């Protein structure tokens, strides 16, 4: 039965492109040539309108000498260039392009694919270790030889700009002469050998032994010069030949080539479509096509209440579970004879999941109803544990696929987890583009044609909803199941290629004590020491170049069917944002040093241009141009808005407890996080803070026990206190204090609760509220912030005054003991509140007060002996300070293990509670909790979300290994890596 009229339509889809078609007769849909000789594989048929080179393919050594070597020399030379490096690079590349057009022809694809190997669609499955071991075997060296070990650890001593290929060639030079051949290999011959190498790597078992015995690989070793081999190794490893060459080479070839490549992700299409620089692309020339990767539609994270979210989506939307995996698009072609898998960045993962319906961990389970010839699916690839029957955390997807492929190929032990593909969209079906159809239609088509396979291919569907209550219920259910969150999709929205808008909205649980966003930051400064500290920056972009977001009333739908062009915002400069030292291993420190060696400038001798790099008051010993730097993925506990740090970094705020997760080798200065992205993330996080500050101390009680007071004297304790006696007054708290009577630390959050409970206003940012008349600044610790406030003329009151006001239920007069720093006028008024013996006129003298006075000298003496630096060092060890832990342990006979975890937490400043609702984080003691108890905790947390229409903060659930990891690292490590499952 034919469900839809186009299911039996075998007519090929015609793509509208500027004058020249892009589908070639001798090319398969993945862009890999079919058959032919090495030379003929890269010739283009004149009948299909593609460009033809009028001269034979030039030698590969000519490409190396004319382009690669010259650009390398410019990169290595710091002086004596005679002109700026950018200008020299542009001259070299433009001259090469001009020579190619004049002496070879208009088809630059053969050279382009060798110049940009990391953008080549071919996969050789060769890593550093594979190449090193294969070369050692080729040189007939014993296993684990000194040469092999030296090559395997090449990064440790490699200077900047030197790659593994250089060391490999040096070892070859020591053991043999350079090959003497009658004829050099041409560019087409090199491409032909690479085609054969790709074929060999995808047939049967592939290892370093297979590479060493590969006919194609050995042919190149025996017919290439040392210079050619160096670049050949780079091509096989898919590492950049020359940094920044992609943008330069594409732009020199055609003014639209770089923008077009971001959409089609295929060098062959770019080269064969844009060969005439006089023919320019138009906006409507971009569309999804079968077999070619594209940028997917991304969900936006918003900062508004759920009622407004529902209104923004037209009160008609789908709710889907947000999966924690890799965004993968599947291109199903020729009834399953050809299948391709692409990531959101256009990386081809077909080798992991199967190139046709008869092989692979996913492809052989991908089934459709009769009549489906070709289609494009959008979904998420996750890891599924078959024994526990649950989705595993992100990071195991590719390894799960590799293990499954190995099991199906060799029959070895079956892995416990495997990849699962969750499909949620259909974009193309039998020649018909569906991106201009709304979500309702696309889901209807998808449900009709896809046949799910249990635990392998899953149809990710969700209810169609219309109100905020459905959002909270869905988020609560997602949390109860341990999911990452939910995605809301406007029912009438279209699929916007390469766009992030609010027709798709993602909602994640707001976690306590967590900023919640990973940021990719460029290193711009360094302070060398026993442990280097890096100053990282955000990019300031030109707002005029950003895409205008959809208006609140109109949503995000457009009547136009044309696909948008992705415009990268123009970066104006970089401004300092935070300092990073934690989370970077010794190997990563060496890697950063290797990648940036030779590009650092002493700050005192040569300051950076402020129109490109700008620091706050905190300046480094050395700075680096962002274009020559590295990008770090950074995560933080929260945003730090302290007044004292507002000038340290040019952004005006910084990150608290920030640490590095990894070096982002796939990012550079042009793709790092921007100030606009940071502001969006900060506003999204602060929405919860704003809504909760309004009820600070009402809905959440302090976890500490309240003190009971037995007062003697003039104040009648039986008289009820006035609940709003602080109304109209504003309070800014810089620190807590140690209460001598209760022998406990009173932190700033408790003081804030006390302020709000008595009608006062607790402010977080002094900069925007400094002009208030009835403003009290509370603090007693000698911090940088307090020193700055004192220098600016502010009166500082001890926090004990506020707590005594709450204690006695009235606004007390300021006495000398409550003054930390004040003007002479205020001190004169304060002295009038006590007698000549220093006793208060308004407060009673109690037994506790006398004891506190007796112990005061001892406490002050001990603190002075420690010194400010010692106290600060001690506080840095309290990594869990301010955190409240709920310990999950339902096996009584392992109580000693729980006691150890509890002791570790409390020794680092944390506290333990038996009330789950008060917990900042839940720690499941390893091997001491059951799935039943874990699910009960999740259900409790999920019910908390479901029962409220406001954004509710919830604790993360980790294993006790997280506590141990934090103590070992001496900072808060990423909770996601220790999630309890």
Swiss-Prot record:
- Tell me the SUPFAM superfamilies matching this sequence: BRCT domain (SSF52113), DNA ligase/mRNA capping enzyme, catalytic domain (SSF56091), Nucleic acid-binding proteins (SSF50249)
Q: Metal-binding: is it a keyword of this entry?
A: yes
Where found, per UniProt? Nucleus
Gene Ontology terms, cellular component aspect?
A: DNA ligase IV complex
Keyword field contains Repeat: yes
Which residues are involved in binding Mg(2+) 2? 484
**Where is ATP bound in this sequence?**
320, 322, 327, 380, 424, 484, 489, 506, 508
GO MF terms here are: ATP binding; DNA binding; DNA ligase (ATP) activity; metal ion binding
Segments carrying the region annotation (Disordered) are: 544-563
Q: Name one Pfam family in it.
A: DNA_ligase_A_M
- EC number of the protein: 6.5.1.1
Sites binding Mg(2+) 1 sit at: 380
Q: Which keywords are on file for this protein?
A: ATP-binding, DNA damage, DNA recombination, DNA repair, Ligase, Magnesium, Metal-binding, Nucleotide-binding, Nucleus, Repeat
Task: Name the coenzymes or cofactors required.
Answer: Mg(2+)
Q: What does this protein do?
A: DNA ligase involved in DNA non-homologous end joining (NHEJ); required for double-strand break (DSB) repair.
The name under which this protein is listed is DNA ligase 4
Origin organism of this chain? Eremothecium gossypii (strain ATCC 10895 / CBS 109.51 / FGSC 9923 / NRRL Y-1056) (Yeast)
Q: Which gene encodes it?
A: LIG4
């Amino acid at each position: 039965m034919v469900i839809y009229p186009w299911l039996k339509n075998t007519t090929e889809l015609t793509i509208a492109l500027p004058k020249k078609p892009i589908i070639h007769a001798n090319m398969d849909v993945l862009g890999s040539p079919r058959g032919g000789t090495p030379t003929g594989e890269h010739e283009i048929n004149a009948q299909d309108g593609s460009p033809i080179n009028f001269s034979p393919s030039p030698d590969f050594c000519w490409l190396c000498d004319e382009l690669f070597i010259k650009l390398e020399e410019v990169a290595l030379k710091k002086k004596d260039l005679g002109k700026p490096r950018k200008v020299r690079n542009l001259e070299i590349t433009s001259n090469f392009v001009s020579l190619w057009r004049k002496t070879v022809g208009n088809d630059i694809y053969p050279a382009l694919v060798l110049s940009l190997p990391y953008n080549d669609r071919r996969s050789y499955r060769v890593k550093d270790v594979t190449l090193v071991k294969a070369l050692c075997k080729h040189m007939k060296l014993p296993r684990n030889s000194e040469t092999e070990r030296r090559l395997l650890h090449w990064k440790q001593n490699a200077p900047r700009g030197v790659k593994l290929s250089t060391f490999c060639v040096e070892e070859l030079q020591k053991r043999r002469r350079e090959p003497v051949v009658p004829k050099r290999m041409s560019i087409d011959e090199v491409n032909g050998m690479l085609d054969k190498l790709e074929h060999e790597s995808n047939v049967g078992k592939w290892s370093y032994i297979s590479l060493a015995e590969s006919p194609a690989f050995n042919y190149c070793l025996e017919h290439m010069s040392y210079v050619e081999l160096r670049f050949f190794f780079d091509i096989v490893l898919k590492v950049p030949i020359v940094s920044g060459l992609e943008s330069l080479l594409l732009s020199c070839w055609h003014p639209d080539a770089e923008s077009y490549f971001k959409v089609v992700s295929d060098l062959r299409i770019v080269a064969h479509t844009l060969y005439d620089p006089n023919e320019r692309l138009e906006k409507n020339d971009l569309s999804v096509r079968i077999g070619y990767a594209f940028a997917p539609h991304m969900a936006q994270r918003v900062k508004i209440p759920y009622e407004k979210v529902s209104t923004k989506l037209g009160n008609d939307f789908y709710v889907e579970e947000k999966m924690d995996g890799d965004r993968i698009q599947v291109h199903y072609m020729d009834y399953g004879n050809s299948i391709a898998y692409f990531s959101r960045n256009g990386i081809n993962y077909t080798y992991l999941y199967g190139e046709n319906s008869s092989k692979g961990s996913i492809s052989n389970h991908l089934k459709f109803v009769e009549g489906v010839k070709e289609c494009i699916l959008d979904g998420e690839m996750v890891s599924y544990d078959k024994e526990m029957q649950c989705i595993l955390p992100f990071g195991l997807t590719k390894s799960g696929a590799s293990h499954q492929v190995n099991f199906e190929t060799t029959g070895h032990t079956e892995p416990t987890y495997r990849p699962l593909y969750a499909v949620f969209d259909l974009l193309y079906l039998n020649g018909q583009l569906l991106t201009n159809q709304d979500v309702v239609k696309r889901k209807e088509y998808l449900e009709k044609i896809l046949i799910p396979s249990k635990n392998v291919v899953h149809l990710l569907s969700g209810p169609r909803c219309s109100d905020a209550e459905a959002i909270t219920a869905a988020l609560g259910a997602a949390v109860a199941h341990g999911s990452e969150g939910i995605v809301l999709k406007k029912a009438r929205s279209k699929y916007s290629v390469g766009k992030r808008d609010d027709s798709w909205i993602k909602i994640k649980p707001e976690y306590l004590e967590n900023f919640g966003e990973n940021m990719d930051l460029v290193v711009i400064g360094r302070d060398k020491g026993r442990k280097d500290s890096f100053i990282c920056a955000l990019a300031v972009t030109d707002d005029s170049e950003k895409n205008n977001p959809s208006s609140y009333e109109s949503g995000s739908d457009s009547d136009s069917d044309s696909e948008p062009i992705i415009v990268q915002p123009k970066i104006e400069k970089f401004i300092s944002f935070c300092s990073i030292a934690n989370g970077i291993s010794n190997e990563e420190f060496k890697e950063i040093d290797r990648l940036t060696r030779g590009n650092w400038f002493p700050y005192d001798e040569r300051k950076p241009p402020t129109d490109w790099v700008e620091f706050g008051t905190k300046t480094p010993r050395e700075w680096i141009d962002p274009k020559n730097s590295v990008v770090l993925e950074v995560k933080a506990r929260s945003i730090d808005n302290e007044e004292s740090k507002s000038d340290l970094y040019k952004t005006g705020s910084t990150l608290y407890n920030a640490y590095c997760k990894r070096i982002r080798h796939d990012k550079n200065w042009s793709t790092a996080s921007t100030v606009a992205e940071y502001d969006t993330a900060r506003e999204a996080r602060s929405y919860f803070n704003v809504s909760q500050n309004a009820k600070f101390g009402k809905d959440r009680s302090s976890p500490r026990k309240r003190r009971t007071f037995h007062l003697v004297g003039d104040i009648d304790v039986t008289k009820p206190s006035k609940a709003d006696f602080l109304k109209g007054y504003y309070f800014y708290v810089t620190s807590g204090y140690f209460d001598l009577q209760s022998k406990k630390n009173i932190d700033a959050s408790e003081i804030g609760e006390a302020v709000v409970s008595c009608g006062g206003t607790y402010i977080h940012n002094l900069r925007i509220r400094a002009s208030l008349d009835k403003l009290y600044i509370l603090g007693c610790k000698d911090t940088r912030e307090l020193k700055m406030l004192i220098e600016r003329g502010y009166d500082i009151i001890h926090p004990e005054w506020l707590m005594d006001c709450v204690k006695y239920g009235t606004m007390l007069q300021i006495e000398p003991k409550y003054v930390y720093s004040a003007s002479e006028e205020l001190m004169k008024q304060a002295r009038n509140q006590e007698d000549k013996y220093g006793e208060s006129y308004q407060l009673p003298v109690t037994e506790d007060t006398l004891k506190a006075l007796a112990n005061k000298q001892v406490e002050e003496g001990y603190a002075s002996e420690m010194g400010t630096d010692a106290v600060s060092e001690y506080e840095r060890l309290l990594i869990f300070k301010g955190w409240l832990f709920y310990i999950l342990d339902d096996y009584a006979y392992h109580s000693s293990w729980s006691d150890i975890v509890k002791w570790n937490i409390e020794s680092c400043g944390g506290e333990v509670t038996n009330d789950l609702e008060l917990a900042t984080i839940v720690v499941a003691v390893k091997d001491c909790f059951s799935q039943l108890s874990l699910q009960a905790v999740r259900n409790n947390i999920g019910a908390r979300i479901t029962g409220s229409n406001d954004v509710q903060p919830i604790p993360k659930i980790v294993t006790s290994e997280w506590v141990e990891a934090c103590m070992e690292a001496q900072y808060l490590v990423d909770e996601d890596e220790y999630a309890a499952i």
